Amino acid sequence: MTTSYQEVEKQIDLIEEEFEVKCTCEKGCSACCRQLIALSMSECLAIKPYIENLSKDEREKLKRKVLEQCHILEENNITNKVINTTRKEEVIQDKYFKLKMPCVFLDEENSCSIYKVRPSLCWSYRNYGDKADCEKDYDVESTIKYDDWEHRVFERILTARPPRNGLYVLPFAIKEMMEW
C-alpha cells in the first residue's frame, strides 16, 4: 500500500477511535467486492506489477475472469468503460450490483489478492452496521465512504498522470491495461 493510503487509513482509524465506532468489515466478508469498483488508470497501473508477477496459470485464470466479466457486463448493456459522476453512474451501479459478480481479484478465501494496492474506492469504504446489509444493496446507510480523502488521493493521481483521466469499471480497466 502506498504511503498516501497508509496516512489516510491512520486518519480513519483515529476518527473511529475518537468517536468510539468500530468498523464491522473483516477479512473474508467481501460483500462490498460485488459492487461496481471504479478506478483510475493510474490506480490500474499500480496493480499491473502484481498481475505481471503472477504465475502463467494464475495470469491465465485472471484473464479468463476479466474477459468473462467484460462479456457479462456488455450483455447487460454496461458497456461504458468510463464512469462519470452523473445520474448515469447510479443506474450503472444498480445494474452491476444486481449481477452479484465478485471482484476479479477475490481469491478462494474471499480475500483481496491485491490488498496492498487495492483501488481507493475499496480502502475508503467502511461499514459500521450490520454486515448483512451490504449483501442487500450497494447504498447501505451504515457505511461511510471517506470520499474527501479518496478524492484528494485521486487528484494527486490525476496530476501525476493526466492522460486518460476518468474512472473505469474494473474489469474493463484491467482488460485495456493488459491488452487482453
Kindly give the residue locations of the regions a language model identified.
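Short loop/turn segments that flank or connect secondary-structure elements
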Residues: M1-W180
